């Protein structure tokens, strides 16, 4: 049975072909070993998207050999998959997770223009036109990254009230009804929301220009998807939005079929 692994900056998610799945912190190697040990004797192929570098990849390779007796297949950015033409001159510098997002978008949107938005530790945007040409993208700090940066620089971040406001995924509690905060925590939340909303507004405007006014399908993935989804729907209620929380794992399924 095939095992799909999405090793991201913060979390490593996995899914078996039968639908079983799990998640561990990417720096929790022992947790990953415990999870994968339960799959010994079941896995016959491993397909991986990793942005964690060679040291992690080698450890994963050794673990798969030890537990499953097979080497993992690491996804690599390639020209021509579903006719996609990456914008980068050096393919090895395009994040493989972003490339797989484009693969997933092309497989679903077909000949429609696509915008892939990743709302994780970084906020990423990639555009794909109707001819499958990657028009490039944007990378900015994600919601939690901006909030963490503020928390590390100002004294109030160590206050009990601020720490209680932090949720387990790193995001702050929802803002109050006013657009402006009346406490430090609410001010940080409202300010970050305003920054992200402005970013997304520019995405919609610039994508419209790049696509010559043609409508596009927006694919949204990442841990902050609910927060970003609300902003996108507020900015353009008519936006065609596809929620793809496991876009990398879904794309790995497609990629594994081409590897067979």
Swiss-Prot record:
The keyword rRNA processing belongs to this UniProt entry's keyword annotation: no
GO CC terms in record: cytoplasm
EC numbers on record: 2.7.1.33
Cofactor comment: A monovalent cation. Ammonium or potassium.
Sections of the chain in a coiled coil: none
Biological pathway: Cofactor biosynthesis; coenzyme A biosynthesis; CoA from (R)-pantothenate: step 1/5
One Gene Ontology term of the molecular function aspect: ATP binding
Reaction(s) the record says it catalyses: (R)-pantothenate + ATP = (R)-4'-phosphopantothenate + ADP + H(+)
Entry-linked InterPro entries: ATPase_NBD, Type_III_PanK
Catalytic residue list: 97 (proton acceptor)
Its job: Catalyzes the phosphorylation of pantothenate (Pan), the first step in CoA biosynthesis.
Homology family: Belongs to the type III pantothenate kinase family.
UniProt protein name: Type III pantothenate kinase
Protein source organism: Saccharophagus degradans (strain 2-40 / ATCC 43961 / DSM 17024)
Recorded name of the encoding gene: coaX
